[in-house]
Amino acid sequence: MGLSQEELKKINELKNTARFQHSWKAIRNILTWKERVQNYFVRNMFLLLFCFLGGSSLMLLTDEGILPRSEFIDALMMLLVRLGIFFLALHIFSVLLYNLIGPGWEAKQKAKLRKLYESDILAPILQALYPSSEIDMEHDIAPNQVKEVVPKSQYYIQSGILELNDERNLQTVDLYAYNVEKGNKGYYDVTHFLGQVYSIKNTFSLKGELRIVPTEHFLLFENQGYYPGTMQDGKKIDVEDIQHNEHYNIYCTNEQSTRKFLTPTVIEWFNSMTSRHKLSFYSNESRIYFADCNNQSFFAAPQHKKSLQAWRIEETAIQLKYAFYFANEVTEMLHKNEGFS
């Protein structure tokens, strides 16, 4: 998937605007602040070392008679000693101050980075492609609903909500779901889901709750990981398609409505996804949710200097287009489901 010539023109014009350049510079400053702090400490240590080595060398040279003792040499040695003491005190103070405020400052910088990137970089790119779209940075897709379509985890981190403001009320977010576990070397994150979650209005005749989750097989054992199973008042059902039963588990509260939904067209579409996506699906009577676990964050800001240097506005625009292309593919599948919509 690529960009049209018109889209390329729009985003290149956007990239050259003063506001975009100013925001990008601010992002670069956020990502390089720790490097600048490290350079500051290295510079202080170098100056401290220079002062003490310089003072010691002058003292040794005068004691050996290589340099004549004079008021100038004495004053210079005294200056170097005082500067050394100053830089030593400054270094100790800086280390204590950094240890005191550094962690909190870093957390604030991360929050600032996300907000700045979504509002001043991602949103303008999105609006260049889809003029009526916006990013809601104040809310999440309802966490209780997100938990119905992704693996059970301790923590769920969402991006801002990308909204097309169309008749489907399409919303999408990056989602990172993970647990924190303790190992021999301390605590570490265990990723359960990394990808995108989509939500649209349920304008179809799908009743009750329906959940379709991917499965994996090893020898004779089936495993659906941490994906949720049967909901309250629900049950697990199978379909006649063997391939579908091998790759997905289906749970519902209204079997009649679910079987009406699971036409050969829908089943074939889900089967076609197995080689491309790890797709899960959940619906209630108001909204439909589907999640694409692809181990990618489409909407995340660069997290370090290397990713900042590798960032390209064209690639970001293509990822945005792909996300909505995938959402359109799911929606079209639902509409093509003859006799259902």
Regions found by a protein language model. Name each.
Residues 65, 92-121:
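Transmembrane-cytosolic junction motif
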Residues 182-184:
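Flexible, membrane-facing loop/turn or short amphipathic-helix motifs
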Residues 30-44, 87, 105, 109:
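Amphipathic coiled-coil alpha-helices
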Residues 65-91:
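Hydrophobic alpha-helical transmembrane segments
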Residues 38-64, 89, 93:
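Canonical alpha-helical transmembrane segments of integral membrane proteins
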Residues 1-41:
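Cytosolic juxtamembrane N-terminal segments of multi-pass membrane proteins
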Residues 123, 127-131, 135-178, 187-341:
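Charged, low-complexity intrinsically disordered regions
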